[in-house]
Amino acid sequence: MTRFRWLMILGRICISFLLFFSISSHSETAPDRTTFTMAYSADPAGSLTMAWYHRLISEAFDRLGISLDYRVYPPLRAATLLKTGKIDVEGLRDASYADDNPDAIIVRESILTTTYGMATLDPEIELKRLADFQHKPYRVEYLRGVEPLGDILKDVVTEGYLSAITSPEQGLQKLLAGRSDVFVDFPGRISALIESMDLSLAGIQVNEFEDDIVVYPVLHRRHVDLAQPLQQVLSEMKAQGLFEQYMEETRKVFLLPHDQ
């Protein structure tokens, strides 16, 4: 095992302990506090970006007197749980998410601007933007429930060449089996999955699209009265420089240099 991989594993263990003690401290010091359940599509214990995001959003809710617990679900499952009121918050959705989800209340203070990426085995497939799929004969797959990715791809991928799958593992497996040409998802999740599935020598290329996607926290509509206070708290934290401070601190836990 390489030294870098050992460092990554050590970093993830540290993140797991930090998340555990963060949750434990809330429950011990304030047992009567309200606790919200938040849905993520990637585990903060294994993702630099999600660990940073979870620290920020947890503090924001903490300032409002609310403890935050989280669960990891596929995007479509998370949307269903929010619709039925079985979770309180979703972590990362774009502004148009509420258009098709009337139970979703967008908190209009962006924490993160993200990008999509693609995995392929074909070195001749070179795409810089999602719009570059137009008029290409590529069999494209994406993870069901990741929006607005699905809507974007439906507009640009050749009819009959686009399909939705239920897990990112399935996306890589079908790619390796020659049943698809491109798998589109978040590049960080793809890269982490390649490592966890021990596919680093499989020849899978991961490239990031140039399109920027701005994402927001989402509340269930029963918490609509919290949308404005949460927006204000996040705005204050951003002005206080905590977004940058916490990112640097999280990078140190993950043992990554500043430019990664």
Predicted features and spans:
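Short loop->beta-strand "edge-of-pocket" segments that line small-molecule binding or catalytic clefts
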Residues: P31-S47, L130-P148
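Ligand-binding clefts/hinges and TM-proximal coupling segments of bilobed small-molecule sensing domains
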Residues: S67, R144-G160, S235-Q260
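Periplasmic-binding protein-like
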Residues: L112-G117, E195-L234, F254-D259
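Acidic, polar ligand-binding/catalytic clefts
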Residues: R71-H135, R144-P148, E208-F209
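A ligand-binding cleft/hinge motif common to bilobed small-molecule-binding domains
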Residues: T80, L92-P102, D181-E210
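Extended ligand-binding regions for polar small-molecule ligands
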Residues: H54-R63, P123-L127, A131-R139, Y216-E249, ...
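Short helices/loops that flank or line small-molecule/ion binding pockets
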Residues: L76-D88, D155, P168-R189, S196-M197
